[in-house]
From Swiss-Prot:
It holds the Pfam family PEPcase. The gene is ppc. It catalyses: oxaloacetate + phosphate = phosphoenolpyruvate + hydrogencarbonate. Keywords: Carbon dioxide fixation, Lyase, Magnesium. It comes from Pseudomonas fluorescens (strain Pf0-1). PANTHER family: PHOSPHOENOLPYRUVATE CARBOXYLASE (PTHR30523:SF6). Belongs to the PEPCase type 1 family. This is Phosphoenolpyruvate carboxylase. One of its GO terms (cellular component) is cytosol. Forms oxaloacetate, a four-carbon dicarboxylic acid source for the tricarboxylic acid cycle. The active site is at H138, K543.
Length: 876
């Protein structure tokens, strides 16, 4: 057993014991014995004995016991997560190696210096990096903000008990605090009774910044600066902000009628309020600390006749921040003109801070300047006055419908009936026309009015508060031009990045020609004024074609875009729309970035961070810092040491794998007439739509699999542990390649091609979490007899996938090379197994009894969904 295993088990045992005390206090010893019997049964079952007994004890639970049993195992899993997260950041002995996340940047910089990169070029490249992490809301982020704060406090107590020199009384005090926090969490309802609004989701995102990223960014920058100095003798300039944040929360209206123009306006104002409030706290601390009198002439000129010039300048800034916060707050309820002292430009925030910083250095007080003042400056450069840049996202069909209404009103015919050439000709002409397209008396329908109102909000908002306008389900050049025209008509006079999102297999294959067409159109380059941004969709392409074909289509699309932009001498910014799960393009960010096509990460990288992964990757400051380090190092490495392009043999084999993969995937998902009904019966998919998990509906419209959003599609299969979308297709594709005698070539690709290695590693990870026996238990409780053979067939395919991956990696067990990860999975299974069996029982009762919303069965079902999501650490 490794050191991490032993410590992790100790912490989990302690937290479990304290939770047991809490449960005993509420329900008595007999009930706690029942929980313990179920837990031990699950543990024994993993060793192959008591399955029937475990199922029977769960099936015999009375209606009153369902919810507390589900809650007990849900809380066990959340506490196991806290212990695991803490193990990633716990205090290490001097003799132990620092974790990879801490070493990765210093080691990379040393390697780059050894390979001949000059100190100046490295410092310049690091300072110029543009990495943007786009925080998105997530229907399956089931943990409430209240509980997340309690979990963070529990993690802090685990850290406190790690100190070697604690007295017995101090250790006892920590245990008492842990007991109280666990009791508070247990007695707090873990599930929302009502769906969160888009504004609630945005506030959740701001809370992650306030409680974690606000601390993590300056610490991360300080360490990056130290690593750069150690390797080159140079420092990061004050204006460097290699990692910034954007958000979709309150801006993503694709398929979500609850995100309106008014919501977008409210979220933009809340971000300004929150930013001003956070800077006020910083400036208050600085004013208390910077009591020095000696100052530069420039600072004295700004401070006026003051014996404490730093405090005088900071007081002026404090007044302006207070005015900004008060104005933003007042504007939430009524349109309020901004007073003269409201901050509008980031320079207004930076100038007084830089003045103080430079003055302290000039006067020999650099050690003071480089403390909290430098941290505040780093935050101001990273977060600015608007905290995050808000993207707007809408479906291309909404823009086409608006254009049709406009052209029909003007007597020009129906835009949607025109071919692509007619559309481009009309849009190009109107974009260059100085007169407005819309007459003042035009009365649009409600849908078109909402599209236009959103464009007007964009026009009214400060440019620096906004990111990109993303067009989902984009497929043609006219999709981009239509948005540019609607923005122009609404008074958007500055350039705004209008970004096509290519999501299906066909659209990914067509991405290159679409961008090439745009770049050759008259006037398009002038409107661009910056890089051409293109978003690559991972979720819908995988749902459409399976991950084998989708991954290769994404790779080829990026290669073609790099080539076209190079030919056209335009900079390219690729925006990766990844989910938290492998079926939605998720996986370790560091490996994913290093597996991108050569030239596609040229100092720029933009990616979505999904709701439930935001908490795991950025919820605690120390863990956030580790993940920021990984992003920074990976983007720098991919920029300066891009991987080699694949050989013709690798390409040919990848083409074959993709073709075999998509055929196998679609044979099951699209061509088997029983498949949709099997999916609905064997997973909680139907019930997920009823649960108050997010502000967005689970379906785009009525219909089969294609109408389902990618998230509930993945979520359903994850809950039953079949994990089908992440692996289906690979088992056939790899088996056929081996039958053709291409095993050696597959091994070479895995060894030498980061793209292929990363795909196989992520496939192995998801197969290690999949569990055919758990999936079978759902079938036995929920599926009609005529559909059972399909379930058996899918489990056979899962077994085939496991065998072929083991053959390829030369291991006897999945993840044998990663004992820590295996231990984390094993530890959780003891608590997950009862929840899966309980969920199958709850689904059976719910469907049989047609239960009311809010009933104990429905509540317990919700808790089981939350617990399994927490236990698997990725959901949809």
């Amino acid at each position: 057993m490794t050191d991490i295993d032993a410590r992790l088990r100790e912490d989990v045992h302690l937290l479990g014991e304290l939770l047991g005390n809490t449960i005993r206090d509420q329900y008595g010893e007999a009930f706690l014995d029942k929980i313990e019997q179920i837990r031990k049964g699950a543990k024994a079952d993993r060793r192959g004995s008591m399955d029937a007994e475990l199922s029977a004890s769960l099936n015999q639970l009375s209606e009153d016991e369902l919810l507390p049993v589900a809650r007990a195992f849900n809380q066990f899993l959340n506490l196991a997560n806290i212990a695991e997260q803490y193990q990633l950041i716990h205090r290490r002995e001097e003799t132990q190696a620092a974790p990879f996340e801490s070493r990765v940047l210093p080691e990379l910089l040393a390697r780059l210096r050894n390979e001949g990169h000059s100190a100046e070029s490295l410092a310049r490249q690091l300072a110029r990096l543009e990495i943007e992490l786009v925080l998105t809301a997530h229907p399956t982020e089931v943990a409430r903000r209240t509980l997340i704060q309690k979990y963070d406090a529990i993690a802090a107590q685990l850290a406190a008990q790690d100190h070697r020199d604690l007295t017995t009384a101090e250790r006892e005090q920590i245990h008492n605090t842990l007991q109280r926090l666990i009791a508070e969490a247990w007695h707090t309802e873990e599930i929302r009774r009502t769906r969160p609004t888009p504004v609630d989701e945005a506030k959740w995102g701001f809370a992650v910044i306030e409680h974690s990223l606000w601390q993590a960014i300056p610490h991360h920058m300080r360490k990056a600066d130290q690593a750069l100095f150690a390797a080159t003798g140079l420092r990061l300039p004050l204006e460097a902000a290699p990692i910034r944040f954007a958000s979709w929360m309150g801006g993503d209206r694709d398929g979500n009628p609850n995100v309106t123009a008014a919501v977008t306006r409210e979220v933009l104002l809340l971000a300004r309020w929150m930013a001003a409030d956070l800077y006020l706290r910083d400036v208050d601390h600085l004013a208390a600390e910077l009591s020095m009198q000696q100052a530069s002439d420039a600072l004295k000129a700004r401070a006026g006749d003051s014996a404490e010039p730093y405090r005088a300048v900071l007081k002026q800034l404090r007044e302006r921040l207070r005015a900004t916060r008060n104005w933003a707050h007042a504007s939430l309820t009524a349109t309020t003109p901004a007073p003269a002292d409201v901050l509008h430009n980031n320079r207004d925030l930076l100038d007084p801070l830089e003045l103080c910083f430079n003055s302290l250095h000039e006067c020999g007080m650099g050690v003071i300047a480089d403390g909290p003042l430098l941290d505040c400056l780093r935050r101001a450069v990273t977060f600015g006055l608007f905290l995050v840049r808000l993207d707007v996202r809408q479906d291309s069909s909404r823009h086409s419908a608006a254009m049709t209404e406009i052209t029909d009103y003007l007597g020009l015919g129906k835009y949607e009936e025109w071919d692509e050439e007619q559309r481009i000709s009309f849009l190009t002409r109107e974009l260059q026309n100085r007169r407005p397209l819309l007459p003042a008396h035009f009365k649009p329908s409600a849908d078109t009015a909402e599209v236009l109102a959103t464009c007007k909000e964009i026009a009214a908002a400060p440019g620096a508060s906004l990111g990109s306008y993303v067009i989902s389900m984009a497929g043609a050049a006219s999709d981009v031009l239509a948005v540019q025209l609607l923005l122009k008509e609404s008074g958007v006079l500055r350039p705004m990045r209008v970004v096509p999102l290519f999501e299906t297999l066909a659209d990914l294959d067509n991405a290159g020609p679409v961008i090439e067409r745009l770049l050759l159109l008259p006037g398009y380059r002038a409107r661009l004024q910056g890089p051409q941004e293109v978003m690559i969709g991972y979720s819908d392409s995988a749902k459409d074609a399976g991950t084998t074909a989708a991954a290769w289509a994404q790779y080829r699309a990026q290669e073609r875009l790099v080539e076209i932009c190079r030919e056209q001498q335009v900079e390219l910014l690729l925006f990766h729309g990844r989910g938290g799960t492998v079926g939605r393009g998720g996986g370790p960010a560091h490996a994913a970035i290093l597996s991108q096509p050569p030239g596609s990460v040229a100092g720029r990288f933009r990616t979505t961070e999904q709701g439930e992964m935001i908490r795991f990757k950025f919820g605690l400051p120390d863990i956030a810092e580790q993940n920021l380090n990984l992003y920074l190092a990976a983007v720098l490495e991919a920029t300066l040491l891009p991987p080699p392009p694949p050989t013709p043999e690798w390409r040919h084999l990848m083409d074959e794998l993709a073709a075999d993969g998509v055929a196998a995937y679609r044979a099951v998902v699209r061509e088997n007439p029983q498949f949709v009904e099997y999916f609905r019966q064997s997973t909680p998919e139907q019930e997920l739509g009823r649960l108050p998990l997010g502000s967005r509906p689970a379906k785009r419209r009525a219909g089969g699999i294609e109408s389902l959003r990618a998230i509930p599609w993945i979520f359903g299969w994850t809950q039953t542990r079949l994990m089908l979308p992440a692996w289906l297709g690979w088992e056939t594709a790899l088996s056929k390649a081996l039958e053709r005698g291409e095993g050696e070539l597959l091994g070479q690709m895995r060894e030498q091609w980061p793209f292929f290695r990363t795909r196989i590693d992520m496939l192995e990870m998801v197969l290690a979490k999949a569990d055919a026996d758990i999936a079978l238990s759902y079938d036995e409780r929920l599926v009609e007899p005529d559909l059972l053979p399909l379930g058996a067939h899918l489990r056979d395919l899962l077994s085939q996938a496991c065998s072929v991956v083991l053959g390829l990696t030369g291991q006897s067990q999945l993840l044998a090379h990663s004992p820590d990860t295996l231990e984390f999975i094993r530890l959780r299974n003891t608590y997950l197994d009862p929840l899966h069996l309980l969920q199958a029982e709850l689904l059976a009762r719910s469907r049989r009894q047609n239960v009311e919303q809010g009933s104990p069965v429905e509540q317990a079902l919700l808790v089981s969904v939350a617990g399994i999501a927490a236990g698997l650490r990725n959901t949809g």
